[in-house]
């Protein structure tokens, strides 16, 4: 099994537990297995999401939603929670549905996976990766010849590719070598570069509910937005980046983002509220009389953006300027000039085409004995634990299926 990340570990454990006689070897090319698990979720590890109905769960996957429905019925968030609980790790649910270990420490998850692998008899080899695979008949039902990076050749009844996504994934070249189609990988879950005077100095400011859209597209999201020193981040931005991964890549990440800071109000509704405030409180300063749930410092910037001086009162605001303020509140346009990686959850879309994979077993339809799990597949979810859930699910399915084709003395 190639890839010592979440999917690879889960597959190796599932296989070894299902067939104690199988010889299961897990290869990790680096010396740091489970590295992504360690740093995800700000070091807390967002294990999964409290969305228990598979029909609802699949809606959080821009790629792979249809294909994951069956797998999630077999092993979804409920099974994930039970799996970790059965190994002494309790998970908690936060207000937004994200689930973390009660320790708030990813080391808990890392230790659990390492311990489960050791107890199941998985042989972990770090600093050793997979260099090549080819179909070959061997003893005891071996179907594949695997060449490791150090030159060692191993005959195996089954091989798993759980080597992750991204342009540099060795799994892509290995899959391509046996005939698989690779959907070109592009970034997903990224933040936006925005250089705008309305945001200067507001780093760390959070707007709890905004509406955003990429102008000229159908890409729209609602949720929290965070102002950063490079531009914009937060759940709404990350979800939009996931659903628009290919479209925004094609635009070279240069587009106009329209933000409704007064969501769910439309511009006309906001204008009427502002007119009412002007009539009722003509002597109040506009910069401090914020009728919406917009952070005070941001409201001051929006008022300035509408051409309203800091000391101006409502009485001095003309209808034209008031309309401009309503637009600033509900349809602020920001020029996006690029992207930055989301440090807590770095994901790509693209990978091995799902049409060429049996999603009930994760086995290749083109190369019997070859299996896939995790981000090497053309599957990705939005932020919130969904990508880890896909890793647990596909890893578990692959491990179970690989165990079913093992026999005494066979290796995987």
Name these PLM-found stretches.
Residues 42-93:
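Glycine-rich active-site loop/strand segments that organize a redox cofactor
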